């Protein structure tokens, strides 16, 4: 009996030790589509911080395309990872990612971009941590209106140029949120003009804005709405080309890190500022949720909306970027 008790104790001790070893050696992946982007570098940095705080190792892998994504999941499984956070290079890879992860009994959390199935429908069964697109758009509209009032513009001589990309869900929700906030603040709906861009970059938005400007020679002051910094910058460049002064243009982008060189210019331009989201929150929160799911069996909510955003302008951008771990960019 004495021997039997000792054996039981040894088994119990081994179980405890193996459990603590699992916690000690727990590995979780964090896969991103564009590792060269400051946004994703910050997500990785704060995923590492979560790992340090909670006691797990973060395996960071760049996944710029579908093939590399599926290979990365194989590598994670080979290294003993129990799950991963991913910003996919293509939302349509969702079904393949989930199937492969299931095959290895790995947990998956999507960050920044939601998976869609083969029919293009959102895969809302996969937990998602994402910027609150509508709320950030609303904030853009509110800040534009506030700055317009500060400058004392005559509303009758002012208009909104909304550079849209409605085929992209995030873009549509941001620009719609912005226009709705402007209307709610009292800006006349009939003076809100939408123009679609062929691409969400400076050249695409520049062409779209030019086509709008020639249609409205009566407008003396423009508010520029776009889904990111580049679309707003394209709009600002177009107004400069048409002879508008910086004081008659207010553009507020979304992203922040792409606005640094513009906000650093010696002279102010029509690009007033940008809404800087929170890659630090995305990186830490998604990793923490994955850890709790794997280590404690606490299933994360299907949708976690991140609303933390700060307006950066020429006056505060260096300090605010530093706070987010994006300084020196």
From Swiss-Prot:
Induction of expression: Induced by arabinose. Transcription is dependent on the transcription factor AraC, the cAMP receptor protein (CRP) and cAMP.
Organism: Escherichia coli (strain K12)
Function: Involved in the high-affinity L-arabinose membrane transport system. Binds with high affinity to arabinose, but can also bind D-galactose (approximately 2-fold reduction) and D-fucose (approximately 40-fold reduction).
Site keyed The binding site for the sugar molecule has not yet been established, but C-87 may be involved: positions: 87
Signal sequence extent: 1-23
UniProt entry tagged with the keyword Signal: yes
Annotated keywords: Periplasm, Signal, Sugar transport, Transport
Location of this chain's protein in the cell: Periplasm
Gene Ontology biological-process entries: L-arabinose transmembrane transport
Protein name in UniProt: L-arabinose-binding periplasmic protein
């Amino acid at each position: 009996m004495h021997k039997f008790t000792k054996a039981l104790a040894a088994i119990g001790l081994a179980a405890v030790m193996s459990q603590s070893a699992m916690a000690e050696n727990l590995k979780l992946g964090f896969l991103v589509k564009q590792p060269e982007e400051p946004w994703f570098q910050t997500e990785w940095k704060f995923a590492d911080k979560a790992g340090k705080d909670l006691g797990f190792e973060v395996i960071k892998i760049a996944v710029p395309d579908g093939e590399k994504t599926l290979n990365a999941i194989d590598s994670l499984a080979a290294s003993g990872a129990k799950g991963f956070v991913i910003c996919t290079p293509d939302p349509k890879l969702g079904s393949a990612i989930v199937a492969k992860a299931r095959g290895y009994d790995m947990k998956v959390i999507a960050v920044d971009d939601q998976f869609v199935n083969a029919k293009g429908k959102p895969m809302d069964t996969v937990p998602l941590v994402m910027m609150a697109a509508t709320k950030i758009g609303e904030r853009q509209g509110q800040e534009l209106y506030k700055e317009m009032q500060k400058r004392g513009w005559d509303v009758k001589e002012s208009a909104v140029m909304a550079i849209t990309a409605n085929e992209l869900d995030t873009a549509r929700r941001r620009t719609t949120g912005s226009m709705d906030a402007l209307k709610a603040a009292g800006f006349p709906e009939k003076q809100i003009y939408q123009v679609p861009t062929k691409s969400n970059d400076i050249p695409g938005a520049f062409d779209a804005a030019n086509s709008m400007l020639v249609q409205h020679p009566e407008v003396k002051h423009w508010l520029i709405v776009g889904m990111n910094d580049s679309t707003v910058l394209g709009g600002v460049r177009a107004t400069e080309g048409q002879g508008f002064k910086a004081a008659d243009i207010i553009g507020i982008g979304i992203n922040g890190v792409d606005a640094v060189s513009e906000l650093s210019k010696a002279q102010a331009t029509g690009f007033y500022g940008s809404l800087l989201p929170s890659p630090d929150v995305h990186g830490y929160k998604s990793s923490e949720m994955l850890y709790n799911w794997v280590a404690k069996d606490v299933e994360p909510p299907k949708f976690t909306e991140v609303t933390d955003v700060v307006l950066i302008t020429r006056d505060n951008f260096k300090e605010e970027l530093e706070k987010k771990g994006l300084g020196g960019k």
